[in-house]
Curated annotation (Swiss-Prot):
Family: Belongs to the ATG5 family.
Role, per record: Involved in cytoplasm to vacuole transport (Cvt) and autophagic vesicle formation. Autophagy is essential for maintenance of amino acid levels and protein synthesis under nitrogen starvation. Required for selective autophagic degradation of the nucleus (nucleophagy). Also required for mitophagy, which eliminates defective or superfluous mitochondria in order to fulfill cellular energy requirements and prevent excess ROS production.
Keyword S-adenosyl-L-methionine attributed: no
Main location: membrane
Protein name (record): Autophagy protein 5
InterPro entries, per database record: Atg5, ATG5_HBR, Atg5_HR, ATG5_UblA, Atg5_UblA_dom_sf, ATG5_UblB
Organism: Coccidioides immitis (strain RS) (Valley fever fungus)
Modified how: Conjugated to ATG12; which is essential for autophagy.
Organism lineage string: Eukaryota, Fungi, Dikarya, Ascomycota, Pezizomycotina
Keyword set, alphabetical order: Autophagy, Isopeptide bond, Membrane, Protein transport, Transport, Ubl conjugation
Assembly behavior: Conjugated with ATG12.
Amino acid sequence: MAASSASTSAIQQRVWQGRIPLQIVLSPSECRIYDQSDPYIISIPRLSYLPFILPRLFSFFSSSLIDPDVQAHDGWFSFEGVPLKWHYPVGLLYDLYAGAEPITSKSLSSPGSEREHYVRGGTRENISESGAEGEKDDNHGHDHEFKRDALPWRLMVHFHDWPEQDLIRLDPEGKILHDAFINSVKEADCLRNGTAKRIMALSKEDSSGLWKSVEEHNLPAYHRIHNTLLLPTPPTPFRNIPIRIFLPAPPDSPSPSLKVIQSPIPPLIQPTASPSSSISSASRQMQPQVQTIGTALNSLLPSLFPSKRTPMLAKPVLHGAVVPMSAPVEEVVKCAGYADGWLGVVVSMVG
C-alpha cells in the first residue's frame, strides 16, 4: 500500500533534520604547532556536503597553517587516512566509514533510544513507516549495542598533498561541486522518467534554486523544485528507481576502496507464469508485485541477501537506520532519497 502524501512529507522532513556532529582537526604536517591546534566542532546536516564548510575551516585554521598561500578550495578531508569523496553526502560517508551500529525499530522502542538515535547521527523517524501494510520483517534479531564513541565523527582536513588518484580537484567558485551534483540529479531523473527532459527543461532560476536549496539546507525550496518539477506526476509510476548499493571493503582488504552496485530497478516486478501452473494460480501470478528493498537486494546481491524478507547475512542501512526489507523501493526513494534523488543504501554485515 502506497504511503500517503502527508506521511511521505513527514518522513522526508525527518530525514532532512538528521545531523552529524563533526570534530575536525588540521593535518599535523601542515600545522605550525603540529597537533596542538584546537579542533573545529560543527553539527552538519546528513544531506549536506563537506566542501560547503571549507571556507569556515580555512578561516578557523588560517593562523595555524604553515603555508600562507593555500586557499579554501585546496581543502580535502580524510578519515583514518582514507580520503573522503567530496561528491558523496556527509551522511552516506558516515554510514560507510564510521562503523557505528545502525538503528533498528527495536532499538528505537527502548527507553531513551530516540535521543540516542538523534545524538549519534541518525534520523528521528523510523523508515519502516514507508513499509507495505500488512507485511512483517525480521529486522529485530540482529540488534547490537550502540558504539557510543562513534560521535562526534573525527575527521582531518588537509590543504596540501591533494590525493589525485582518489579525488578530483575543486575550484574557487564551487563550479565543480555544483556540476557533479547536477549531473547526479540528471542521471537520477533519467532513471525515474526514462529521459532527462524534466531537468533539462528547468529554467535557469529553478536549476540555480535547486542547488541553492541544498547549499542552504532549505527543504521547502527544495521540495518546490525537486518534488514538484522533477518527480513523475501521480499516478504515473517511476520508470526505474535511482538506487546505489555501497559495499564497504572487508576489514582485511589491502585497500580502503568500496564497491558500488548500480542497476536499473523497476518499481514493479512483472509476473512470469510457470508452464505447470494451474489457471487460478497463473492468474494470481500475472499480477505485478511491488518491488521492495528485499526483492531489489535479492536481485542485485543474492549471495548477501538470499532471503527477500529477512536480513540473514547483511542489513540495508539508509540514513543511519536499518531499512525494513518489505519497504516498497519507490516509496522509500520518495521520502528518504538523498538531495540528488538517489537512494544510497549501505550494506552492513550482520554479527
